[in-house]
């Protein structure tokens, strides 16, 4: 459908708040349990079937990117690469007589688990891109289950510690020359988009409903203004103070109503 554009496909990402009705996983703490890459590496037959399907669909094209969810160690990336290479060579052999070409896909990982924030240089040696999963990263950094009504009020992507972590990620990614994208609620919110632009993120993944609003907003501000706003946010002591700075700035730009409605 889009042979000239990169197509990113994520390997099976279930568990936690993404259950499969035909593959029930009963755990006392599912968010810290058997989910994402942990599950599929324990079941390489599932991983290989999915990767083979991705590769089959990409025969004759060169735009496939495979993304691994819930990575927490370098060894998980290494084992995933081994299995992807196995599938690649299997499919290559199967189509050898057809004259068709199979290109090796680019490989990326989701940055959702805090441990990987401290191993980005090591991980950069094994992958082609990073993608920050801000929703899960926020709940792990703040130790908050966002689906638990008793503590959901503590979940906030504008917590200064979360903003600091997101800033560190893009700085380290740039230092290691690895492209980085970010997805999650904050990327599709006007206030969040401004802060992320100030940090250095240039690829924001969001719901299609938010695209026009965010596109319109970023045309109304400069990068220098985003950086100044970020500086105030990073030195704040709470998310409430962050929002005070955001609202004050945006009111001066005549954009306060937009942010209050979308933040």
Predicted regions, residues:
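Conserved alpha/beta-domain cores
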Residues: 1-263
């Amino acid at each position: 459908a889009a042979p000239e554009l990169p197509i990113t496909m994520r390997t099976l990402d279930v568990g936690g708040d993404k259950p499969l009705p035909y593959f029930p996983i009963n755990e006392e703490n599912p968010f810290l349990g058997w989910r994402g890459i942990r599950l599929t590496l324990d079941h390489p037959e599932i991983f290989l079937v999915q990767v083979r399907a991705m590769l089959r669909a990409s025969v004759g094209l060169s735009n496939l990117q495979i993304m691994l969810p819930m990575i927490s160690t370098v060894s998980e990336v290494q084992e995933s690469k081994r299995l992807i290479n196995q599938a690649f060579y299997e499919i290559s052999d199967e189509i050898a007589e057809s004259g068709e070409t199979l290109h090796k896909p680019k490989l990326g990982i989701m940055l959702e688990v805090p441990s990987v924030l401290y191993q980005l240089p090591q991980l950069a040696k094994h992958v082609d891109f990073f993608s920050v999963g801000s929703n899960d990263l926020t709940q792990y950094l703040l130790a908050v289950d966002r689906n638990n009504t008793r503590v959901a009020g503590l979940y906030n992507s504008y917590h200064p510690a979360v903003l600091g972590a997101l800033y560190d990620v893009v700085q380290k990614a740039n230092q290691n020359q690895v492209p980085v994208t970010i997805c999650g609620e904050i990327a599709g919110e006007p206030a969040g988009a401004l802060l992320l632009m100030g940090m250095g993120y240039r690829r924001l993944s969001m719901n299609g409903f938010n695209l026009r609003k965010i596109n319109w907003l970023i045309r109304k501000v400069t990068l220098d203004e985003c950086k100044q706003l970020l500086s105030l946010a990073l030195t704040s002591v709470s998310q409430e103070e962050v929002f005070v700075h955001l609202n004050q700035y945006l009111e001066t730009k005549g954009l306060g109503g937009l942010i209050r409605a979308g933040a």
